Regions:
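N-terminal targeting leaders of membrane proteins
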Residues: 27-121, 210-255, 647-649
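N-terminal cap/lid segment of alpha/beta-hydrolase-fold proteins
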Residues: 256-304
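Short, surface-exposed "cap/lid" segments of acyl-processing enzymes
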Residues: 300-347
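Alpha/beta-hydrolase active-site loop
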Residues: 358-383
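Alpha/beta-hydrolase-fold enzymes
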Residues: 409-529
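Short beta-strand/loop motif that positions the catalytic acidic residue
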Residues: 584-587
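Conserved alpha/beta-hydrolase "acid-adjacent" motif
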Residues: 592-598
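Catalytic histidine-centered segment of alpha/beta-hydrolase-like enzymes
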Residues: 617-629
Length: 649
């Protein structure tokens, strides 16, 4: 989190705290779980299927680590954030890039020693060449010259990695005050890193380095914390996996293998083009009746009257995630105002927008979304009177499915409710059951590997994913993942979504399903129990019992389950969707969340001017491409013009 230049005194004080935290560990609850092997109720076949074990990171001193994480978050919020705001305002982007490059160049001795200690002499030579080139041609390291011109990429190694190569493979995860996430092994390695960092011995230079690095990193940190229900848990998993894979020198992506599953991962390339676009937004809150918290929404408003796009992200999509902001940026650049809320499975919406503790039933989820959008629309009109023309509801993935449901069930006679002139769905699933069973199957794709090969292949896949996210691949080239690797990554992401949803549902009421005791400072044990639940198991263990309790037309059996799932299939609303001039659908023929029957239904039952199906792209994996964006924009602009010219009935 903060400097890698750590004082020995601070580290010793942390060691004392570590000893205290070890005592706290004795208070942790063991993981307990229901034995589903003999269960013969609704959905029994799903509970008794073989499952891949979720990647587990032991955390024996979790109470201590969480306490330090909260302390560090306070520092980031109350000290670093104001500094970042000033720095971002007064420093041009080109200068920020130069400072970042210069600081990275100054870490050359650390990388050099880290490579030497591991016997990586060719890497050490490459690092030396990089340093000489960037320090001379690159004006003291302010301009990155070595990689784009000479092909010399950074060889990032450190003393902690050297310890790992020497045999210290696994180490206790540790959060240090001021320094953030590390392990005992890597924490000791920080002392060696500091010793070979020349800036450590120049107090003012070290201070500038530390302040600059954490200030530059703040926006990424803030979005990560805000977008995740439990950023500590995800941060721990990513940090430890990254360190393990770096030590093991797991392979990075190369050239591509084409598949719909791998193309889906292209969503990582959907990023804002202007890093300052987010700064032009405004964020407000509305109070949804019966919600526990206020619901935030973010908007970008044109100076003149313009169409207003209500943007719904995917399942647990965050309103400020890169993909959401990128779509908003494209729409804003074409003259529309944009407003967005977080997805219905996101922790923000679960706390501030939903009326029931178990999301997953399309009609109720969509109704909650519509209620929230109605409040948002009224609040925007109050703040920006006369600035909005047409209202367009645009949903991505699950947000697109909710968009289509609202299109099919709209009631234009209702007073004081937002009226949409156009409903646009991008990569919306058609059949919820097909989509979630596909995601469950994806998560278990490593079962096809031999048991002794499975751990290595899973970690190799995770290394590829981490490198892709860090921008180590070309956005114009498909990612090099086999279909099974891509499937596992997609399934893994959605398994964490269900974990967070179940945990939050259990906070509101005890469904009698989970057995592990939850503590204020320990979540590892209950998470391990929850992670045993697939999407379909969540449906049968939580959603079905809940609706069987509150609705007389739903019974706790397979008939009741099929009744709920039928209402989550868009074919049930075909009469109001097919041929509706206010409804548009954009998708990809090789989207795994669409069955062949779904694609055929869209192609044959919908009007030709309603549907655009691209040949490739997987699930949202081609939205970063200019040609795809151009087609969507052209069809949208034509549809808006048609709606404007068509007199109301």
């Amino acid at each position: 989190m903060l400097p890698r230049a750590v004082s020995f005194g601070l580290f010793c004080r942390c060691a004392v705290l570590l000893a205290v935290a070890t005592l706290l560990n004795s208070c942790q609850s063991p993981t307990r779980a229901v034995d589903w092997s003999q269960y013969d109720g609704p959905g029994a076949r799903y509970f008794q299927q073989d499952e891949v074990s979720f990647p587990h990171v032991p955390d024996p001193i979790e109470p201590f680590n969480r306490a330090v994480s909260i302390f560090n978050h306070g520092l980031m919020t109350w000290i670093v954030r104001p500094i970042h705001s000033v720095y971002w305002f007064v420093t041009p982007t080109i200068l920020q890039t130069g400072i970042s490059n210069g600081l990275d160049n100054a870490r050359f001795p650390q990388r050099l020693v880290g490579n030497f200690l591991q016997g990586k002499l060719s890497n050490a030579a490459s690092e030396t060449g990089r340093f000489l080139i960037n320090s001379t041609v690159g004006l003291g390291g302010l301009i990155e010259v070595a990689e784009p011109i000479f092909g010399l990429s950074p060889q990032r190694e450190d003393v902690g990695q050297a310890f790992g190569r020497w045999g210290w493979q696994h180490s206790t995860y540790l959060q240090l005050p001021l320094l953030g996430p590390t392990t005992v092994r890597d924490g000791i390695g920080l002392i060696g890193d500091a010793a070979v960092n020349p800036l450590t011995y120049v107090t003012w230079a070290s201070t500038i380095q530390n302040a600059s690095e954490v200030t530059i990193a703040y926006p990424t940190y803030a979005r990560f914390v805000e977008s995740n229900f439990d950023p500590y848990e995800l941060g721990r998993l990513l940090f430890v996996l990254d360190r393990e894979l770096s030590i093991a020198d797991a392979p990075s992506p190369g050239l591509a293998q084409a598949s719909g599953q791998a193309e889906t991962l292209g969503i990582v390339y959907l990023e804002p083009e202007d890093p300052r676009f987010l700064d032009r937004s405004d964020t407000y809150e509305v109070q949804v009746p019966v919600a526990r918290e206020r619901l935030p929404y973010t908007c970008w408003i044109q100076d003149e009257a313009a169409p207003l796009i209500f943007l719904l992200p995917g399942t647990s999509g965050y309103r400020l995630a890169d993909s959401t902001v990128a779509v908003a940026e494209r729409a804003f650049g074409r003259g529309a105002s944009v407003v967005t809320i977080s997805g219905s499975f996101n922790h923000e919406f679960l706390a501030g927008g939903t009326t029931n503790p178990v999301p997953g039933f399309l009609p109720d989820d969509a109704a909650d979304v519509y209620s929230a959008l109605n409040l948002v629309a009224a609040d925007l009109e109050r703040r920006y009177p006369g600035r909005f023309e047409e209202n367009i509801l645009l949903g991505l993935s699950l947000g697109g499915m909710q968009t289509l449901y609202l299109a099919a069930t709209e009631n234009p006679t209702l007073p004081e409710h937002v009226k949409f002139d156009l409903f646009v769905a991008i990569n919306a699933p058609v059949d919820t059951k097909h989509a979630i069973t596909t995601l469950d199957r994806f998560y278990n794709s490593p079962l096809e590997y031999e048991p002794h090969q499975r751990p290595y292949k899973i970690r190799r896949t995770l290394r590829k994913a981490l490198d892709a996210v860090r921008g180590m691949t070309d956005a114009h080239a498909p990612l090099n993942f086999s279909p099974s690797e891509a499937e596992f990554l997609i399934g893994l992401a959605f398994r964490t979504i269900i974990r967070d949803v179940i945990y939050q549902a259990q906070e509101q009421r005890d469904f009698g399903v989970l057995k592990t005791v939850r503590g204020n400072w320990t979540r590892t044990a209950p998470y391990r129990e929850i992670l045993q639940f697939s999407f379909m198991e969540y449906f049968y263990a939580f959603v079905l019992p809940y609706y069987a309790e509150i609705r007389p037309d739903v019974t706790f059996d397979e008939t009741g389950a099929e009744h709920l799932l039928a209402a989550c299939d868009l074919r049930a609303y075909a009469a109001k969707l097919c041929g509706n001039p206010k409804v548009l659908y954009f998708g990809n023929k090789n989207d795994s969340l669409l069955s062949p029957a779904d694609v055929a239904w869209l192609q044959t039952e919908w009007s030709a001017d309603q549907v655009v199906l691209f040949e490739r792209g997987g699930h949202m994996g081609n939205l970063h491409r200019d040609d795809v964006q151009g087609v969507i924009a052209a069809v949208l602009e034509h549809a808006i013009a048609q709606q404007t010219e068509t007199p109301p009935k």
